[in-house]
């Protein structure tokens, strides 16, 4: 490796270790420009892309490293990890096998290959049993006959949820306590019944003295969610909330966040709204921690019922005919209309898959360049400012509001104002140092941005319940 390229690599490694990912990628890129045949440089940049969640770019760089040196085990390991991150375990198995063949004494490669093979077997088994529509996980449960544990000292959940119960539940969660299964199942059942009557695109009017608080990703950061309520008031009939997906996974209080949002939705069904994000899906939950958290804190049935409710969540919201709010972004087709979004049959499809309107609503990202481009994530696509403008003008919208990506300041107005990103998980995964933000909207439809910092939380690391295949990213 040329001396200057080596110096750039060493400096980039330092930035990466300190969590300054953008600077690290920039320096790796400069080093590659000086030495474009060095596998280590591509592999290191692949790791940086893994940390920034640009999994498609991570796969590309790992593949380039393999082209430069087909015997470089770490590159296969990086590529396998990126495939796992976008739930492509079958592709990952081959790379883990190659990494282990090249480094047979590496215990990490051996362990991850075994876990990946087990995951593939599990997927195949589930595919085999799901050829026919499985019964609801709520079937054959008589919730009313379930017992409440004798040591439960909280407010009792009656037939109708109450503000007293919700406030007590929130406080108990702060103390590390769980819901009795009777109450957990009751909340999930009632929420399921409510969502079954909800369209795929919901209309949210904001009138008179009402305020709507739009929140982006919260990702299991329960104590930051409570801080949002402290700063902007809890949900109420006049203080509405819209949560724009990705409220589970990564953070280690995802069940607490989910039950809190669901309880508020039941308490104020016309004032609390929840869009589906790409992490309210089975594939992501198996890898990023929510399934593991449900199993640890409750049981497998609890996860299966959550999964059923996730498949019923609306895919988008329309605020006073002015702003479309979706988790990911816009579409591969310029001619998509709001009526098409309303008519999506989310009840039969359930999971977003790899193509189609549902997938694009959950996965796509904006790009600075005009037109459309491949996704840096490896799923979906990227859309430019001209795409945003055409969509808004064709559908009579002021802008599209989306989430799905960290922003250093918690939000970003993009595409000449036609695309706005809001992200509400400050210091995401305890590592990025970003601010969180929410958007407040009143009847005049002016957007009011509010930023906030992370608050302390108990000493449980992010991804504590995640699949071990992602460790070391």
Swiss-Prot record:
Q: Which cofactor does it need?
A: Mg(2+); Mn(2+)
Q: Which SUPFAM superfamilies match?
A: Metallo-dependent phosphatases, TPR-like
Q: Which residues bind Mn(2+) 2?
A: 246, 278, 327, 404
Q: What is its EC number?
A: 3.1.3.16
Catalytic activity reads:
O-phospho-L-seryl-[protein] + H2O = L-seryl-[protein] + phosphate; O-phospho-L-threonyl-[protein] + H2O = L-threonyl-[protein] + phosphate
Which residues catalyse the reaction? 279
Q: What does this protein do?
A: Protein phosphatase that specifically binds to and dephosphorylates the molecular chaperone Hsp90. Dephosphorylation positively regulates the Hsp90 chaperone machinery.
Matches recorded under PANTHER family: SERINE/THREONINE-PROTEIN PHOSPHATASE 5-RELATED (PTHR45668), SERINE_THREONINE-PROTEIN PHOSPHATASE 5 (PTHR45668:SF5)
| Protein name, UniProt field | Serine/threonine-protein phosphatase T
Annotated organism of origin: Schizosaccharomyces pombe (strain 972 / ATCC 24843) (Fission yeast)
């Amino acid at each position: 490796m040329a001396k200057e390229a080596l110096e750039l690599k060493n400096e980039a490694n330092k930035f990466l270790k300190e969590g300054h990912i953008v600077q690290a990628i920039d320096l790796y890129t400069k080093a590659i420009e000086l030495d474009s045949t060095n596998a280590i440089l591509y592999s290191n940049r692949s790791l940086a892309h893994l940390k920034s969640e640009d999994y498609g770019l991570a796969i590309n760089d790992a593949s380039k490293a393999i082209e430069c040196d087909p015997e470089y085990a770490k590159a296969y390991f990086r590529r396998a990890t990126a495939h796992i991150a976008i739930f492509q375990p079958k592709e990952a198995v081959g790379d883990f096998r190659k990494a282990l063949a090249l480094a047979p004494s590496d215990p990490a490669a051996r362990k991850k290959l075994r876990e990946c093979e087990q995951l593939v077997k599990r997927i195949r088994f589930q595919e085999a049993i799901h050829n026919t529509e499985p019964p609801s996980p709520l079937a054959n449960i008589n919730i009313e006959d379930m017992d409440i544990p004798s040591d439960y000292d909280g407010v009792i959940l009656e037939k109708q949820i109450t503000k007293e119960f919700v406030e007590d539940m929130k406080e108990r969660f702060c103390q590390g306590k769980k819901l009795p299964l009777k109450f957990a199942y009751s909340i999930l059942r009632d929420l399921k019944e409510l969502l079954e009557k909800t369209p795929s695109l919901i209309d949210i009017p904001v009138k008179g003295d009402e305020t709507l608080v739009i929140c982006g990703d919260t990702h299991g950061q329960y104590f930051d969610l409570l801080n949002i309520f402290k700063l902007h008031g809890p949900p109420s009939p006049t203080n509405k909330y819209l949560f724009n997906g990705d409220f589970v996974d990564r953070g280690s209080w995802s069940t607490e966040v989910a039950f809190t949002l669901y309880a508020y939705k039941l308490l104020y069904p016309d004032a609390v709204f929840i869009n589906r994000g790409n992490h309210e899906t089975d594939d992501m939950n198996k890898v990023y921690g929510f399934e593991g958290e449900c199993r640890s804190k409750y049981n497998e049935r609890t996860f299966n019922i959550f999964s059923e409710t996730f498949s019923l969540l609306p895919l988008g919201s329309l605020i006073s005919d002015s702003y479309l709010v979706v988790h990911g972004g816009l579409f591969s087709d310029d001619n998509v209309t709001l009526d098409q979004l309303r008519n999506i049959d989310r009840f039969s499809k359930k999971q977003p898959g790899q193509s189609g309107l549902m997938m694009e609503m959950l996965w796509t990202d904006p790009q600075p360049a005009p037109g459309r481009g491949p996704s840096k994530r490896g799923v979906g696509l990227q859309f430019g400012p001209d795409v945003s403008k055409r969509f808004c003008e064709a559908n009579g919208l002021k802008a599209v509001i989306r989430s799905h990506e960290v922003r250093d300041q918690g939000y970003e107005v993009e595409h000449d104002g036609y695309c706005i990103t809001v992200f509400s998980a400050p210091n995401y995964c305890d590592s990025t140092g970003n601010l969180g933000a929410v958007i407040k909207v009143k009847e005049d439809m002016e957007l009011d941005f509010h930023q906030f910092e992370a608050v302390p939380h108990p000493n449980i690391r992010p991804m504590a319940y995640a699949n071990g295949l992602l460790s070391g990213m």
